[in-house]
């Protein structure tokens, strides 16, 4: 009798697993209430391994989405998947990596985001007209959610082939590299760059209550554009090493 019950439980488990694995993604996702502003169209594949031809968030096209759920994570009470998105995105934002939801909330590991700098700068409230060239890449080694920003996170942000253009001239920045960390929603970002035109370093911090502090300096190098040199007279005097410092703090 016990053996029959055991076989029955085993058969039921295998059957349920097979149903879940082969359940069409369209059938599984259609009844679910998606967050307001999120739209998924062209859903294909299974709940386990599928894709959406188009993802839209608040009216913005994010391109396609592919996912591959991890069975091992489900056994630990977590919903985890490898995802890739961005092909066909109107903003050219692309991303890939591991995302999941556990008992402690959302998380991500080894996640990479890529976006043209020309697109990113349009989202910033700049006091003067600027254009940017190059590619932004954010590599998130690990992220653990915690109100309001993150319980823990670390990674890097790189801006390759960086260039800023203004009505009075362009500045070649080369590669701007920075590292970021987060502990208890205290976010810090530190980095710098150097080219034949200019060198700089910066250090930013953001508190959970949205207070921020920024410290930075830049130094004109030998090939600093002549059209921009004229504007240096409007700045405070540089220090003994020829660096122009900036310090700012406030509330976002």
From Swiss-Prot:
Q: In its UniProt record, which GO terms are filed under biological process? A: protein secretion by the type II secretion system
Ranges that cross the membrane:
5-25
One short Pfam family name for this protein?
Answer: T2SSN
Going by the UniProt record, its keywords in alphabetical order are: Cell inner membrane, Cell membrane, Membrane, Protein transport, Transmembrane, Transmembrane helix, Transport
Which sequence ranges are listed under topological domain Periplasmic?
26-252
Question: According to the lineage, what is the superkingdom?
Answer: Bacteria
Side Cytoplasmic, residues: 1-4
Q: Hey, which family's this protein in? A: Belongs to the GSP N family.
Q: What is this protein called?
A: Type II secretion system protein N
Q: Which organism is it from?
A: Vibrio cholerae serotype O1 (strain ATCC 39315 / El Tor Inaba N16961)
């Amino acid at each position: 009798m016990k053996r029959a019950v055991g076989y029955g439980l085993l058969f039921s488990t295998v059957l349920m697993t097979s149903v879940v694995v082969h359940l069409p993604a369209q059938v599984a996702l259609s009844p679910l209430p998606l967050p307001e502003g999120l739209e998924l169209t062209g859903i294909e594949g299974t709940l386990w391994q599928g894709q959406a031809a188009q993802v839209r968030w608040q009216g913005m096209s994010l391109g396609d989405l592919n996912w591959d759920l991890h069975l091992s994570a489900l056994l630990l009470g977590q919903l985890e998947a490898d995802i890739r998105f961005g092909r066909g995105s109107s903003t050219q934002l692309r991303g890939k990596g591991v995302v999941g939801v556990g008992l402690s909330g959302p998380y991500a590991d080894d996640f990479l985001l890529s976006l043209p700098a020309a697109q990113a700068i349009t989202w910033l409230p700049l006091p003067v007209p600027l254009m940017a060239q190059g590619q932004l890449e954010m590599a998130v080694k690990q992220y653990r959610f915690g109100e309001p920003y993150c319980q823990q996170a670390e990674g890097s942000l790189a801006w390759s082939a960086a260039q800023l253009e203004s009505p009075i001239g362009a500045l070649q920045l080369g590669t701007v590299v920075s590292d970021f960390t987060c502990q208890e929603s205290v976010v810090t970002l530190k980095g710098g760059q150097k080219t034949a035109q200019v060198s700089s370093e910066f250090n930013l911090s953001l508190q959970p209550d949205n207070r921020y502090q920024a410290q930075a300096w830049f130094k004109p190098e030998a090939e600093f554009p002549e059209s921009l040199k004229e504007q240096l007279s409007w700045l405070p005097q540089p220090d003994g090493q020829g660096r122009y410092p900036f310090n700012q703090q406030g509330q976002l």
